[in-house]
Amino acid sequence: MILILADSLRYDFAVRYLKGVFPEESWSSFEAIETFTAPVLATVATGTPPEVHGVKWFTDEVNPDACKDTLFDHFDSWVTISRLIGNGPKWLPPSRRDNLNFLPPIRWNAVTNNDDDVLEYVGRKWSIATNEWWDLIFYHSWLTHGPWGVDCYGPKELPCIKNCDRLMARMTKEELHKWYKIGVDDFKTRLMAFKNISNNLETVIVFADHGEALKDEGGATGHFKGGHHIADLAKVPIWINRRETIPDDINHVTLKDWVIKMYKKYELDNSEYQEYKEKICRK
């Protein structure tokens, strides 16, 4: 299974430009539990809301009681690919350099912070030349994420992007949409690669942590904490490359249990999938 958190992916752009990549798809939407990433990641991993797991910012630790039964405990093997969670890059701000274990004690098994490396891991999983296999690849994609939304990487910490906030504020709605769509198109290419590499045997679930403000409602750009009053920030897409009924109550809290259910249905109980896995792992 590939579980994809498409950071900052808006529902309207997803429906308009990403529908139809897979032969079969089922779509839905829900309201984000928060409109920035850290508490959403903790919620998806633990299946608990922020008031239970306690994450309010990127450097927080997760309440250990919320980590007794995480998403990853239901997979024999998994890897996480994320710019936030992977091996800490040198450009991390001071607030993060002493907190390289992202949202501990969640066991992410992060292997890289390079967004492009996901293709390598999916390719290695499905290549008959290797005996590597991961039951879950958790991919936190930044292809639709804009630097104007990363307020913790400010002028003092990253001078190279010190003018991004001002630049985005000065751009027109049309310009913002144009540049945002480039990221959406890149993400579409990646989804097509996942489909082709696995011959659509891999179950792929895509959802967003929050949307993105692009001056559709007032002058706001990017994303920020407490942005539920902006519809394009609060409404997020979710879809699966299977003909499936997505529950009406799906949200960031219930997502964990539904993902586990889909994994059991389409992979653990899928004879074709399990036969291929056995051949690979016997090598």
Model-inferred region functions:
Residues 1-2, 134-138, 203:
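Residue-level preference for the first positions of well-ordered beta-strands
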Residues 3, 8-133, 142-148, 258-282:
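Active-site-proximal alpha/beta segments of enzymes that process anionic O-linked groups
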Residues 48-49, 241-246:
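Short loop segments at secondary-structure junctions
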Residues 81-92, 138-174:
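Extended, charge-rich helix/loop segments that form flexible
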Residues 116-133, 157-208, 237-240, 256-258, ...:
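A long, amphipathic alpha-helix that forms part
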Residues 201-203, 207-243:
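Histidine-centered active-site microenvironments of extracellular/periplasmic hydrolases
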Residues 247-253:
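A short, structured beta-strand-centered segment in the mid-to-C-terminal lobe
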